[in-house]
Amino acid sequence: MNKILLMAGVCALLSSAAFAQLNKVAVISVWGDKNLSDDPMDTKMYEVLMKDTSFNISHIVHDFDNLLIQDILPEFPFPFMDKADVVSAEGYQELKELSTYKNPAVSYSIIPAKDYVPLAAFGAVLQDDEAIVKAFELLPDVDGVMIAYINFNMVDAGGVGPYAAKKVQAYCNIKIFNKEGKRIFKLKESAPSDKKVSSVGGIVTEPKKITPLVFQASDNLFADIKKTLPKKLAKMVKKIEKENAK
C-alpha cells in the first residue's frame, strides 16, 4: 500500500492503486461541527457557546458545500454523482438510522449541509462504517464515496502563563472510502483566524467574541483551498501516474 503526502496540511493517498481505479464517486455526507473542543466526542467544552442561538454556522456549512461542488470536486481525476441524485436516492435518507448523529447527545453541535445525512468519519475513534458500506448498495453506479466536513478548534496564540490569547483554527476534512468501507484518500487543510481573543486559565471569558473568529477562520480556509488545492491534487495525480508506469 502506498502513501503519498503533499506539502502543507495533509493530502494523503492511502492506496494509490485503489484511487487510480475509481471511475465515479458520490459525496454522501457534508456537515459542520461547532464544538470547539479538540475531542470530537467532548461536547462539554464551550457548551455555553454551542447552545447560544446567535452562534450559527449554517451559512458556513452552506458555503463549504458550494465550495466542494464548484471548486474542489472538479479538481479530482474522476467524475462525481450529482448531489441531487445522491440525496434523493431510494433509502439514502434512512442512512440517518445508521448514523452516530441520530443520538441527540452527540448531534446538537452538528450542522448538516442541505439534504445530507451527517455521518461520522473519524477512523478508529468514531466512524459510521455500516452506513458507508450501505451507501454503495443505494448508489450502485459508484465505486467510491466521500464524506466532507468542517470543524473548528481554539488554539494558543501567544500570551504569558494563564493569560494566553486564543485564535480559532478552521479545518476542512475530505475522505474517500472504497466498497469495503476502507479509507483510501484523505485531505485535511486548516487556517487560523487573523484576530485573537483573551483567555484566563485557557478558558475564553467572553464566548460571544469567538463567533467572528470562527467566520474569519472559515473565510481564510476557503480562500487557501481555492489557491492551493488544484496544485496539490495535480501533483498527487502525477505521482499516481508515475507509480502506475513502473
Where are each of the predicted segments found?
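Generic alpha-helix detector with strongest preference for long hydrophobic helices that associate
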Residues: 8, 45, 49, 53, ...
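N-terminal segment of the mature soluble domain
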Residues: 41-147, 179-186
